[in-house]
Swiss-Prot record:
It comes from the Bacteria. The gene is gyrB. One of its GO terms (molecular function) is ATP binding. Belongs to the type II topoisomerase family. The lineage of its organism: Bacteria, Pseudomonadati, Pseudomonadota, Gammaproteobacteria, Enterobacterales. The active site is at E42 (proton acceptor (atpase activity)). This is DNA gyrase subunit B. Its EC number is 5.6.2.2. Changing W751R: In microcin B17 resistant mutant. When the enzyme transiently cleaves DNA a phosphotyrosine bond is formed between GyrA and DNA in an ATP-independent manner. In the presence of quinolones this intermediate can be trapped and is used as an indicator of drug toxicity. Changing I10G: No dimerization of residues 2-393, fragment has significantly decreased ATPase activity. It catalyses: ATP-dependent breakage, passage and rejoining of double-stranded DNA. It is an enzyme of class 5 (isomerase).
Length: 804
C-alpha cells in the first residue's frame, strides 16, 4: 500500500506543478484580479452543480478579514471513502488530481457549469493554505492543505446531523500579484447571475471586512432576472415574453421585455457561464427577432401606415433580454469562454424564437401594439438623427478642419500620446490653456451642465451644443452607424471639475454620456478623473499642496511629531524621533481599521480590546479562561460607559469545534444586541492587529507621564490624549486654504498640481459590474423619482465633506 501511495502522490504533484507553472491556462490572468476571483467561482460552481442535481439549497460565500474566502454548501458533502485506484480518500483525490470529479461520469451531473473540469484541485494548487471541512454520514471530516499538499490524511473531528462541504482558501501571493484582494462587487455580480440562472438556489455573500451582506434568492429564474434588470426603468408592456424549451439535447431559455429607455441590453449565457461577446446564441436571437417583428408589422399593416422600414437596431431599442442555453458539449472561441461558436445553437435558438415570439405577438395584441409603436418611434428618430448629422456635416465642411472653436488642440498626432482635458467653465479653461503642455495636452472648456443623456432621445442629444462640441472633439463619431472607438483622437480623456456639488454633477453627466454612448472608451480605460489638490498649507514662507483629507492628517501628524518627546514617567528615557513616529503611525492605522469595523462592532468595545490582555486560540478551549477574560472586558466597559448603555456577557459552547466563544451583549434603550467574539474573530487579522498595538501601549504611560514639544509640556493619562494635544499644538501658525474651484489656482499652480505628468494624480474609470452600473445610472440619472429618493435615504449618512 505504501509503495502505491508514494507513487500516486508523485503523480499528483506533477499535475499540480503544471498548474503552478502556467496558472493562466487554468484560471485566467493572475495579475489583474480575474484569475483571483475565478478561484472563488470554481468552488462555487461545484456547489451549484450539487444544487442543479437537487441536493443543495443554500450556498454561503464569505470574504474573511484575512483575505481568505470560504464557500459553504448544504449538499451531500464530498465522498470521504477511500478511492479504489488512488488509495487515499475520495475527497483528497478531488482536491489534488486534475480532471477528477463527478463531471465525467455522465450519471452524476448531466450539464455542468464547472468550468474546465479542473475545478477545485486548481484552487488548491494556487492557495498557500486550504481548509476542507466535510459534513457527511453523521461525521465532521477536516483536512488542511498547503500549496496543494495535504498536511495529514482526512480526519474525523466531531459529529453532526448536517451535511455539506466547506472550502476555505488563502490565495498564494507567489501566484497572484498586483491585485491580491477580493472585490465584493465582482463576486456579487457573478453570484447574482448564478442565483437567477438556477431558480430557487439561495446564495448569501458576506464580507467580514466591512459587514456588507447580500442575499440572492430568486424563484422566477431568468424571468425574474429581466424584472430585476428593469427594476428602476419603466417597462412599456406588462407581460414578460418567456419560454423554456429543449430540442435535440439543446435547452433554450429566453426572457425579454421592452422599457421606455433607448439602450439595448442582452445578456447571454451557456451552461450558466456568461458570454460577454455573445456568439451563435445571440446571432440566432437577433435574426429571429428582427424577422418575426418585421413580418408581424408587414402583416398587420403597421409599416405601410407609418411609412418607415424598421431595422434590427430599431427593434432592440429599450430591450432587456436574457438568453440562456444549456449545451452538452459547447465550443467557445477561447479558454475565457467570452464567445460561443457552436453552430448548432444558432438554428436551435432561431427556430424556437421565430415560432414562440410570433405566437406571443398574436396572443398579446395590446403588448404587440405598444412594442410596434416604440419600434416605429425609434425608426423615425433614427431618420431625424441622420438628417441632423447631415446638417452638421454640411456645416462642418465650412468649419476649419471640423474641430470646435473652443478646443485648444495639441501638436501631437498620435492618439496614444495625446490627452484631452474636459474642463468645467471658461475661467478654469483659460488657466488650463495657459498652464498646459501644448505638445500633447488639448483643452476643451465646457460651459454649464451638459445634457443628461439618460433621459434624452438621440436626436435631442445631437442638437445639444455642448454634446455636439464634445463629439466633434473626440473624433470617433456617435450612433450605431458612425461610432468607431478606434478613431478616438485622444487615448486619455481627463475630466477636470471643481470640488463642489456642481463639479460632481458635471462629472456625473459626462460619465453618463461616456457610459451610455461610448462604452468601449470606458472599457478600454481611456477615461480618467483629475484629482486636483484639496488643500494648500502655509507655514511661515513654506507652501505645500495636499491632495486629500488623509494626506492632511498625515501632514499634521508629521509636523506635530517634529521635536516632540513622550516621557512615560518622570525619570524614564523619553520616547522620540523614529520610535515615537512608528508607534503613532501604528496607532493611527489601527484606529482607521477600528473606524471601518464600527458598522459591525461597538467602537467602545474595540477600543477597550487594545487595553485588555490577548485572548489566544488555545484559550478558547478553556471555559474558565474565556469567562474570566470576557468578564474583565465587560467590567471595564461598564466603568467607562457615558451614554447609559449596559454591558453584559455570555459564553457560547461551540460543540462542533469543542470551543467556548465569548459573546458581548449591550443593552441600549432597553434593546439587547449580541456581538459574538467567535473563533473566526479571535484568529482573524483585525483582532491580531488590535492585540499587537495593545502589547505596545499597555502599561506604557505611568501616573506622572507627560508630552513635550518645544518649550511646552502637558501631563497625559493616555496615548490618545498625548496625540490629540500634539495635533492641536501643531496647528499654531499654520494657515490652511481649501480649494473648491479650479479657477482659484493660477496657470502655474494648475500645471504643478493637476496637469504635470510627473506630479499629478488621476483616477482611471473602470466598470467592474455592468449590471450594477446600469442600475446605478438609471437610479441616479433616470426619470423615476422614488428609487432615487430611496438611494439618497439609504446612503446619506455615508457621505462626508459635501461642499454646497
Amino acid at each position: 500500500m505504501s509503495n502505491s501511495y508514494d507513487s500516486s502522490s508523485i503523480k499528483v504533484l506533477k499535475g499540480l506543478d503544471a498548474v503552478r507553472k502556467r496558472p493562466g491556462m487554468y484560471i485566467g490572468d493572475t495579475d489583474d484580479g480575474t484569475g483571483l476571483h475565478h478561484m472563488v467561482f470554481e468552488v462555487v460552481d461545484n456547489a451549484i452543480d450539487e444544487a442543479l442535481a437537487g441536493h443543495c439549497k443554500e450556498i454561503i460565500v464569505t470574504i474573511h478579514a484575512d483575505n481568505s474566502v470560504s464557500v459553504q454548501d448544504d449538499g451531500r458533502g464530498i465522498p470521504t471513502g477511500i478511492h479504489p485506484e488512488e488509495g487515499v480518500s475520495a475527497a483528497e483525490v478531488i482536491m489534488t488530481v486534475l480532471h477528477a470529479g463527478g463531471k465525467f461520469d455522465d450519471n452524476s451531473y448531466k450539464v455542468s457549469g464547472g468550468l474546465h473540469g479542473v475545478g477545485v484541485s486548481v484552487v488548491n494548487a494556487l492557495s498557500q493554505k486550504l481548509e476542507l471541512v466535510i459534513q457527511r454520514e453523521g461525521k465532521i471530516h477536516r483536512q488542511i492543505y498547503e500549496h496543494g499538499v495535504p498536511q495529514a490524511p482526512l480526519a474525523v473531528t466531531g459529529e453532526t446531523e448536517k451535511t455539506g462541504t466547506m472550502v476555505r482558501f488563502w490565495p498564494s501571493l507567489e501566484t497572484f500579484t498586483n491585485v491580491t484582494e477580493f472585490e465584493y462587487e465582482i463576486l456579487a455580480k457573478r453570484l447574482r447571475e448564478l442565483s437567477f440562472l438556477n431558480s430557487g438556489v439561495s446564495i448569501r455573500l458576506r464580507d467580514k471586512r466591512d459587514g456588507k451582506e447580500d442575499h440572492f434568492h430568486y424563484e422566477g429564474g431568468i424571468k425574474a432576472f429581466v424584472e430585476y434588470l428593469n427594476k428602476n426603468k419603466t417597462p412599456i408592456h406588462p407581460n414578460i415574453f418567456y419560454f423554456s424549451t429543449e430540442k435535440d439535447g439543446i435547452g433554450v431559455e429566453v426572457a425579454l421585455q421592452w422599457n421606455d429607455g433607448f439602450q439595448e441590453n442582452i445578456y447571454c449565457f451557456t451552461n450558466n457561464i456568461p458570454q460577454r461577446d455573445g456568439g451563435t446564441h445571440l446571432a440566432g436571437f437577433r435574426a429571429a427577432m428582427t424577422r418575426t417583428l418585421n413580418a408581424y408589422m408587414d402583416k398587420e399593416g403597421y409599416s405601410k401606415k407609418a411609412k418607415v422600414s424598421a431595422t434590427g437596431d430599431d427593434a432592440r431599442e429599450g430591450l432587456i433580454a436574457v438568453v440562456s442555453v444549456k449545451v452538452p458539449d459547447p465550443k467557445f472561441s477561447s479558454q475565457t469562454k467570452d464567445k460561443l461558436v457552436s453552430s448548432e445553437v444558432k438554428s436551435a435558438v432561431e427556430q424556437q424564437m421565430n415560432e414562440l415570439l410570433a405566437e406571443y405577438l398574436l396572443e398579446n395584441p395590446t403588448d404587440a401594439k405598444i412594442v410596434v409603436g416604440k419600434i416605429i418611434d425609434a425608426a423615425r428618430a433614427r431618420e431625424a438623427a441622420r438628417r441632423a448629422r447631415e446638417m452638421t456635416r454640411r456645416k462642418g465642411a465650412l468649419d476649419l478642419a471640423g474641430l470646435p472653436g473652443k478646443l485648444a488642440d495639441c501638436q501631437e498626432r498620435d492618439p496614444a500620446l495625446s490627452e484631452l482635458y474636459l474642463v468645467e467653465g471658461d475661467s478654469a479653461g483659460g488657466s488650463a490653456k495657459q498652464g498646459r503642455n501644448r505638445k500633447n495636452q488639448a483643452i476643451l472648456p465646457l460651459k454649464g451642465k451638459i445634457l443628461n443623456v439618460e433621459k434624452a432621445r438621440f436626436d435631442k442629444m445631437l442638437s445639444s451644443q455642448e454634446v455636439a462640441t464634445l463629439i466633434t472633439a473626440l473624433g470617433c463619431g456617435i450612433g450605431r452607424d458612425e461610432y468607431n472607438p478606434d478613431k478616438l483622437r485622444y487615448h486619455s480623456i481627463i475630466i477636470m471639475t471643481d470640488a463642489d456639488v456642481d463639479g460632481s454633477h458635471i462629472r456625473t453627466l459626462l460619465l453618463t454620456f461616456f457610459y451610455r454612448q461610448m462604452p468601449e472608451i470606458v472599457e478600454r480605460g481611456h477615461v480618467y478623473i483629475a484629482q486636483p489638490p484639496l488643500y494648500k498649507v502655509k507655514k511661515g514662507k513654506q507652501e505645500q499642496y495636499i491632495k486629500d483629507d488623509e494626506a492632511m492628517d498625515q501632514y499634521q501628524i508629521s509636523i506635530a511629531l517634529d521635536g516632540a518627546t513622550l516621557h512615560t514617567n518622570a525619570s524614564a528615557p523619553a520616547l522620540a524621533g523614529e520610535a515615537l513616529e512608528k508607534l503613532v503611525s501604528e496607532y493611527n492605522a489601527t484606529q482607521k481599521m477600528i473606524n471601518r469595523m464600527e458598522r459591525r462592532y461597538p467602537k467602545a468595545m474595540l477600543k477597550e480590546l487594545i487595553y485588555q490582555p490577548t485572548l489566544t486560540e488555545a484559550d478558547l478551549s478553556d471555559e474558565q479562561t474565556v469567562t474570566r477574560w470576557v468578564n474583565a472586558l465587560v467590567s471595564e466597559l461598564n466603568d467607562k460607559e457615558q451614554h447609559g448603555s449596559q454591558w453584559k456577557f455570555d459564553v457560547h459552547t461551540n460543540a462542533e469545534q469543542n470551543l467556548f466563544e465569548p459573546i458581548v451583549r449591550v443593552r441600549t434603550h432597553g434593546v439587547d444586541t449580541d456581538y459574538p467574539l467567535d473563533h473566526e474573530f479571535i484568529t482573524g487579522g483585525e483582532y491580531r492587529r488590535i492585540c499587537t498595538l495593545g502589547e505596545k501601549l499597555r502599561g506604557l504611560l505611568e501616573e506622572d507621564a507627560f508630552i513635550e514639544r518645544g518649550e511646552r509640556r502637558q501631563p497625559v493619562a493616555s496615548f490618545e490624549q498625548a496625540l490629540d494635544w500634539l495635533v492641536k499644538e501643531s496647528r499654531r501658525g499654520l494657515s490652511i486654504q481649501r480649494y473648491k474651484g479650479l479657477g482659484e489656482m493660477n496657470p502655474e499652480q494648475l500645471w504643478e498640481t493637476t496637469m504635470d505628468p510627473e506630479s499629478r494624480r488621476m483616477l482611471r474609470v473602470t466598470v467592474k459590474d455592468a449590471i450594477a452600473a446600469d442600475q446605478l445610472f438609471t437610479t441616479l440619472m433616470g426619470d423615476a423619482v422614488e428609487p432615487r429618493r430611496a438611494f439618497i435615504e439609504e446612503n446619506a449618512l455615508k457621505a462626508a465633506n459635501i461642499d454646497i
